[in-house]
Amino acid sequence: MFKKILFLLVLATTLFAQSDPASVRPDSAGIYYRMSIQAYSQQQYDRYLEYTQKILQVYPDNYTIQYNLASAYALNQDTINTIKILNSLVDKGLGLVAENDPDFESLQNIPAFKALVKKIERAKKPVKSSKKAFTVAEKDLFPRGIAYDPKTKNLYLSSLYKSKIVRIDRKGKIADFIPEKQDGLGPVIATRIDSDRRILWALSSYGAPNAKTPRDIAGTAYIYKYNLDDGTLIKKYDLLKPRGHFLTELVDDRVGNLYIADTGLRTIFRLDAQKDTLEKFINMRNYPQLTGLTISSDDKFLFVAHGNGILNIEIATGRITPLTHPEHILLVACDCLYFHNNSLIAIQTFLNRIVQFQLSPDFNSVTDYKILESNNSDFSVPSCGIIDGKYFYYVANSQINNLDRAGNILTPEQLKDILIFKAKL
């Protein structure tokens, strides 16, 4: 019972993080969610079902609430609807904890549930195409961003915890490129290299105030422009007012313009290469959790991963088109996004996998997908990557789940060497 309540609370965080708070009516999802928790804890399963159904009326596409609905049906002895929902979730790679969830204990001997368990076991089998490329012995680096210079073959890792950037040369030698907190560098969320212009871009953001983030800098963010050859700071762009910034991703086009995703203000900024000005490019107020950003090879379209899917933005007009997709293909929970040969490479951390989504000719829909890597025992919150020719390099174990909200390490003794994998595309 206690574990289930904790599970529901975790799901609540996911639910409301993916929703515009202004759209949640006080008499609908919020209240019904709290009532569903109370009903569950009091074993009033008929009410638990009733309230969960009402939440789903507001958020019909929320998979976590769909899972809750399956559990509510099971606790009310509705086997048919339980199995139907769980099968749909498992087909998408979700609901893989159902076999051990006590809410479904009464179904253990039912043939349909036994078949579902076998399907879950198949879904949990690893898909492996990656090889280890580099090992970084600095266990407490907590890398979030990775960048690549095709001219020197150097990789660059940015550190959330140590507020620095390290360089890995082609022989695997590792050294600090931008030392800890140099130039006022804070937690480094993402990096990008413009090899032709010899520039390394870095995003640094401060989140909510806590023991490590004083209120006077909370919600501020900075864009750093470094000389890629010697690490000297060329310029620092400040985003101070209004507060609430949190920069997550960046991508550049062929003429040097930089696009930056600000999930805090739900905005995409553009740093104009000719004018050297930072300006708001497009408002993303209807799209929470901007977690991935990439650009088409012809510089005509941006692709943005957000809490509920992936968007195509036509740069010339600002037209936003949510990517359509077959029902069995899941586009949510993409942390980092990369355009490659009319496809998108995505790290779906929540699903513990690296995937490649094939795009339609007009780039407005996903037609198919391929799992490049999944359920790897070395994974511990895989982080961002880079594409070098036919290979995708990525951080296999950022270990960000070992940091609390204030940025403190929870269990230092459990940290491992950082692994950089490469998967053939």
Predicted regions and their residues:
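Beta-rich, blade/repeat-based domains predominating
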Residues: 138-152, 182-198, 202-208, 240-258, ...
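Conserved beta-strand positions in repeat-built beta-propeller and related beta-rich domains
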Residues: 155-161, 201-217, 258-264, 302-308, ...
